């Protein structure tokens, strides 16, 4: 859901006929490693964001106009489907030419960067999820990051599979060192809260760790600041 909000904000327009939509009017590339991207859900999220913007401005918007904005914005999104580790690597290497030819591409999103970890663990004896993720992030940093404003990827938490508590993992020196080594600016870990209908986002940078509460609704994630 959060990844969808990043994409929606990126590809929606900043303004539409004097109404502030609060998008970025940029292009995004989504690498789908699981084949689970649902464009219908992304379109529904964008629809709610547009309607909310118009309601805030006190303006009624015809359904046809909403659909027009959504469909036009979706033209700014390219989805790349991958089926295995080789295809993922080829896609990352091929993106450099595309980014050079289109300056509007501001976001690269990958869901999920660890999709083929188990395949590579069997074939090449890669032991750790962090080790595998690090190899892909190196490619992104070397060939893509200089042309793209933001790279966002989802991943499983290795500590969760080892029955470690998320808080311990998040605040550990090992995790902080890993952020610095991989060149990751922020690590977001989403988890449930003890409060009904509330969730917690743990945000870690190299120098700081904090928690932000949030709720989930049809309009996406709402931060409780």
Pin down the residues of each PLM region.
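Conserved P-loop
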Residues: 1-93
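Conserved catalytic network of the ASCE P-loop NTPase/AAA+ motor domain
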Residues: 14-23, 69-72, 98-102, 142-147, ...
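Loop/turn-to-beta-strand initiation segments
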Residues: 27, 75-76, 103-107, 145-155
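Conserved nucleotide-binding/hydrolysis micro-motifs of P-loop NTPases
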Residues: 34-38, 83-88, 114-115, 157-161, ...
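Short, well-ordered secondary-structure micro-motifs
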Residues: 41, 89-90, 119-121, 162-166, ...
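Conserved AAA+ ATPase "sensor/coupling" helix adjacent to the nucleotide-binding pocket
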Residues: 44-49, 98, 204-207
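Phosphate-binding/switch loop-helix module in NTP-utilizing enzymes
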Residues: 79-146
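Phosphate-binding/switch region of NTP-binding enzymes
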Residues: 130-134, 138-225
